[in-house]
Amino acid sequence: MKVILTENIDSLGLIGSEVAVADGYARNYLLPKKKAVLATEANRKVVELKRVKWEAKIAKEKALAEEMAKRIEGVKVTLKAKVSEEDRLYGSIKVKDIQDALAEKGVEVEKSMILLAESIKTLGTFEVPVRVFAGVKPEIIVEVVPED
């Protein structure tokens, strides 16, 4: 089913984009939550009228995201963890731990913005991307050290 997005959806595209999605996804999620409208000729005309406003909104959001990316890029957080004799962590470092460490440094991000593929289970230094906007992903440095 073809739909026109009425808001930015990370997995699909930006506002105003016409995309093809599964019928059930459109009927059960996108359309009821007003995140998209059916791609009919009438809706295309309405979207064209709103496009200028949306493009200005996207430009403003992207500018704010790039400013935030400059603040975040290269931020180094150090997390202490209990380790075994083989330098394996008891437990792991999760997204919430990184979010809390960033908050202590004055950088407020949502958990969903931190793109950690899997929990960190070893000591060392890791580069973790943070998605602030579509295509804008600065990296932070997470250092895991043993607790004294």
Curated annotation (Swiss-Prot):
Return the PROSITE patterns for the record: RIBOSOMAL_L9
What is the protein's known function?
A: Binds to the 23S rRNA.
- UniProt family annotation: Belongs to the bacterial ribosomal protein bL9 family.
Tell me the Pfam families matching this sequence.
Ribosomal_L9_C (PF03948), Ribosomal_L9_N (PF01281)
Enumerate the Gene Ontology biological process terms.
translation
InterPro entries hit by this protein:
Ribosomal_bL9 (IPR000244), Ribosomal_bL9/RNase_H1_N (IPR009027), Ribosomal_bL9_bac/chp (IPR020594), Ribosomal_bL9_C (IPR020069), Ribosomal_bL9_C_sf (IPR036791), Ribosomal_bL9_N (IPR020070), Ribosomal_bL9_N_sf (IPR036935)
Report TM segments: none
Alphabetically list the UniProt keywords: Ribonucleoprotein, Ribosomal protein, RNA-binding, rRNA-binding
State the organism named in the record.
Desulfatibacillum aliphaticivorans
Q: Give the GO cellular component terms, alphabetically.
A: ribonucleoprotein complex; ribosome
Listed name of the protein: Large ribosomal subunit protein bL9
Task: Supply one GO molecular-function term.
Answer: structural constituent of ribosome
